[in-house]
């Protein structure tokens, strides 16, 4: 606890994904005062043509009350 899930389009390198996960974990431990052993980060790649159905509608539109950072695009 906590577990962070990042959803993004495919195409980022393994090195970029590892670095992103490391930086997210560092910020979570620093801001929320958890030990690094408590933090997990998953990266889920979603194809651009599936984004509206698999991410935008269920995670952004249908759960807007849980968003702390909203995107500046609409679909």
Predicted regions and their residues:
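A domain-level signal for the structural core that forms small-molecule/cofactor-binding pockets
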Residues: 2-75
């Amino acid at each position: 606890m906590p577990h962070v899930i990042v959803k993004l389009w495919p195409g980022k390198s393994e090195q970029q994904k590892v670095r992103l996960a490391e930086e997210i974990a560092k910020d979570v431990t620093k801001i929320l005062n958890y030990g690094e052993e408590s933090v997990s980060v998953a990266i889920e790649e979603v194809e651009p043509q599936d984004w509206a159905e698999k991410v935008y509608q269920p995670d952004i539109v249908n759960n807007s009350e849980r968003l702390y950072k909203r995107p500046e695009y609409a679909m």
